[in-house]
């Protein structure tokens, strides 16, 4: 794939996310308490296989040069992305259990799947804000003896998550920063007038 073709694929992905309502403008509160005028909710993607596959392909193109034999999606939205990557590129996947009942030995298992201590695992996520959810997943994997060196995400909201991961020894690779995403929306998408106005105002503060 040429750089021009990849750029077209990126713009196509953003346009489709806007079309299915995964990108919305307004007044929103993020899970970490921060306020924002643009909300990217990737949950609708699981109902759109073509969009899901495009995003999974873009994320996988970020993969590092070193050998990583496993991947794990951050629960829950990124599970579909990780599964899509696993099937499309034939790479093994493990599953982090978010809820532990502690009622039996089986329920105390943090990570499901076949793996060996010492293997390197890539953490896949849809959107990074504070970085907390990626760190929680990384810790669960590391507790089972896996090595976590990098995380691949679709969108970096540029609110400090990358620095948090770096401090923990994890390199972040993202398909889009929030600034890139908004620029793509403004230049390539037919936005509603109110959304275009909010996007234009937002880009001035990024």
Swiss-Prot record:
- This protein's superkingdom? Bacteria
Q: State its cofactor.
A: Mg(2+)
Catalyzed reaction equations: orotidine 5'-phosphate + diphosphate = orotate + 5-phospho-alpha-D-ribose 1-diphosphate
**Keyword set includes Transferase:** yes
Residue positions binding orotate = 157
Could you say which residues bind 5-phospho-alpha-D-ribose 1-diphosphate here? 97-98, 101, 125-133
Q: Which UniProt keywords apply?
A: Glycosyltransferase, Magnesium, Pyrimidine biosynthesis, Transferase
Matching entries from SUPFAM superfamilies are given as: PRTase-like
EC number(s) stated in the UniProt entry for this protein: 2.4.2.10
Q: What Pfam families does the database record attribute to this sequence?
A: Pribosyltran
The pathway noted for it is: Pyrimidine metabolism; UMP biosynthesis via de novo pathway; UMP from orotate: step 1/2
Broad EC category: transferase
Keyword presence, Transport: no
Q: Which is an annotated GO molecular function term of this record?
A: orotate phosphoribosyltransferase activity
The Gene Ontology biological process terms listed for this entry are: 'de novo' UMP biosynthetic process; pyrimidine nucleobase biosynthetic process
**Quaternary structure (record):** Homodimer.
What does this gene product do? Answer: Catalyzes the transfer of a ribosyl phosphate group from 5-phosphoribose 1-diphosphate to orotate, leading to the formation of orotidine monophosphate (OMP).
The text of the family note is: Belongs to the purine/pyrimidine phosphoribosyltransferase family. PyrE subfamily.
What is the protein name for this chain? Answer: Orotate phosphoribosyltransferase
State which gene encodes it. Answer: pyrE
């Amino acid at each position: 794939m040429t750089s021009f073709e990849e750029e077209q694929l990126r713009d196509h992905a953003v346009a489709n996310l806007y079309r299915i309502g995964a990108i919305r403008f307004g007044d929103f509160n993020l899970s970490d308490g921060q306020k924002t005028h643009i909300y990217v909710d990737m949950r609708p993607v699981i109902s759109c296989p073509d969009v899901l596959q495009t995003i999974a392909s873009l994320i996988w193109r970020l993969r590092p040069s070193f050998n990583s034999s496993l991947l794990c999606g951050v629960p829950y939205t990124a599970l579909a992305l990780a599964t899509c990557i696993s099937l499309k590129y034939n790479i093994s996947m493990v599953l982090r259990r978010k809820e532990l009942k502690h009622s039996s030995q089986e329920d105390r298992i943090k990570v499901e799947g076949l793996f060996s201590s010492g293997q390197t695992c890539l953490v896949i996520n849809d959107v990074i804000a504070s970085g907390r959810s990626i760190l929680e997943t990384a810790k669960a994997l590391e507790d089972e003896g896996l090595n976590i060196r990098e995380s691949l995400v679709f969108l970096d909201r540029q609110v400090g998550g990358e620095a948090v991961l770096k401090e923990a020894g994890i390199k972040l690779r993202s398909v889009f920063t929030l600034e890139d995403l908004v620029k793509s929306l403004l230049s390539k998408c037919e936005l509603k007038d109110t959304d275009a106005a909010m996007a234009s105002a937002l880009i001035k503060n990024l």
